[in-house]
Amino acid sequence: MIDFGNFYSLIAKNHLSHWLETLPAQIANWQREQQHGLFKQWSNAVEFLPEIKPYRLDLLHSVTAESEEPLSAGQIKRIETLMRNLMPWRKGPFSLYGVNIDTEWRSDWKWDRVLPHLSDLTGRTILDVGCGSGYHMWRMIGAGAHLAVGIDPTQLFLCQFEAVRKLLGNDQRAHLLPLGIEQLPALKAFDTVFSMGVLYHRRSPLEHLWQLKDQLVNEGELVLETLVIDGDENTVLVPGDRYAQMRNVYFIPSALALKNWLKKCGFVDIRIADVSVTTTEEQRRTEWMVTESLADFLDPHDPSKTVEGYPAPKRAVLIARKP
């Protein structure tokens, strides 16, 4: 059973303590509910991983843990087998004691695009909405953050995060909670809030922006990364049944339209930090994610379009401040 007690104890002593009025009951309710059919298998994989304290830990340039003496072939095989029980691995990569998890996404590339535009993360308390396996949270810690809290309701991602945490020496500087943004009270407690790869999955994108704003302290920074299309401030794509084979894509604005949405929600100092086409080098099938990936979602005769005929995925990073 994954234990959230350490997180409760941690926030009881800081400016997130008011979250304890609602959070333990929400987590207890989550634990009582019907779990995913494979949750026991996933949590067992975490439990059976060895407890290792890394001799060398690099979270600044990657997520890499190494031991002082190389692990035996049997130890490495044990770790690899247990981590493969947590497939598919979508966000990474991770290098853990000789086990290299080559994930579907090169999330390190996204981090390299985002990091130069951020306010200094040193000492900050951060919320990562839709954090997946938690890769970017570890990079936030590497960049100096005091505490990174991720929320994502996907149970496999929770187990992947806990597996990585265990192999990083049970590091308590990052925590993942199996919740959605709509389950959070207006905490107004985070110095930086990240929402990367979430907005286009929301039926009401402006409501999502308000929810993000409600988590920020005054003068806090929002980092928003999402799909965009080319166009002016009035351009928004509303896909039909699917976009790049995804059913749950609702609104894809232009970067300029997204800037207007942020302004409408009361954000200031809004800037478009980066716009990049997603390539099949950044998102692809690997040994750790063996099903379809981006190459299968693009028109085989015209990779500038999805199989449905829409513009191929392009992502923008916008930075804004809550006044």
Swiss-Prot record:
Catalytically driven reaction(s): carboxy-S-adenosyl-L-methionine + 5-hydroxyuridine(34) in tRNA = 5-carboxymethoxyuridine(34) in tRNA + S-adenosyl-L-homocysteine + H(+)
Coiled-coil residue spans: none
Keyword Iron: no
GO BP field: tRNA wobble uridine modification
Top-rank lineage group of the source organism: Bacteria
GO molecular function: methyltransferase activity; transferase activity, transferring alkyl or aryl (other than methyl) groups
Protein name as annotated: tRNA U34 carboxymethyltransferase
InterPro entries, per database record: CmoB (IPR010017), Mo5U34_MeTrfas-like (IPR027555), SAM-dependent_MTases_sf (IPR029063)
Family affiliation: Belongs to the class I-like SAM-binding methyltransferase superfamily. CmoB family.
